[in-house]
Amino acid sequence: DNMKPNLFKFATSELSQDAFILWLLEWADSECATEDKALHETAQEFVRLLLNNKDLEINSVKCKKQEHHIDVFAIVNEEYALIIEDKTNTSEHGNQLKRYSEWVKGKEQYSELDLHCIYYKTGNESYAKLKRLEENYTKEYPEENFSIITREDVLSVLKQSTTTNAIFCDYTEHLQKIQDLTDSYLSLPIKKWSWEAWQGFYMALEKELQTGDWGYVANPSGGFLGFWWNWNSIASNTDVDIYLQLEEKKLCVKSYQKGGVENGYVYSSQLIELAREK
């Protein structure tokens, strides 16, 4: 029902999402087993998703609130340390997970725990950026457990639940609404596509082409969501790359000068001539 107020329509910040994740993690503790059985069981499935362990028996989950500014930090079964960097629509910056993991490993009371670092993303992000993030982390800490949890991963667990808890249902509906908007490019005419629909289209394009990247490009007229791919050097000049860029409804051929812009006009003129010939 679209008329029903949703808490997460107003609680849009990452702090609100931190609070929900911590709240749900605490529901996985065995002490909550009789309070709301369905919610407890879903919370346990959520922990198994985060730890990538389908058969884990969960007895205790203890959340550590804002310790060392970590978004979400929890100890499971006094055996696993769970660090979550939580993002809605922003991206990872400043190697937060690396800093968090170094801090946890340096603390005597946590040093023996099996550490799991998670990038939890409920907004849309390009596969290329997520892949770079994973490679960046695992290259430095090859022995550590690192995983990316997406909105689809979370929904696959939450939607199985039979709980009627209002906070839980609001969060699930909130994520499903983002998913529906993202998928709406499949059914809506292009002129009606929202920001999320363009993101969904670019994600599908990225998957289909197995290359490219996309993101927001700022400019004085308000910016746009761009998708760029097919980078090639001009044979006669390795200082210049040409590539294709989709600026929502506009397809462009772009040139990029590695060594500065002094010859940009000449290269652009050559490109225009080439395009006319084709």
Language-model features, listed with the residues they occupy:
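A structured, charge-rich N-terminal accessory region that forms the first stable segment of a protein
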Residues: 1-49
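Polyanion-binding interface signature
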Residues: 182-278
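Short hydrophobic-acidic sequence motifs that mark active-site Asp/Glu residues
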Residues: 69-73, 81-85, 239-243, 250-252
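Short, flexible loop/turn elements at secondary-structure junctions
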Residues: 65-67, 76, 87-90, 104, ...
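Gly/Pro-rich interdomain helix-loop hinge
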Residues: 95, 99, 105-222
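Active-site-adjacent loop/helix micro-motif of nuclease/hydrolase catalytic cores
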Residues: 90-99, 261-267
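Active-site metal-binding core of divalent-cation-utilizing nuclease and nuclease-like domains
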Residues: 44-78, 217-221, 228-237
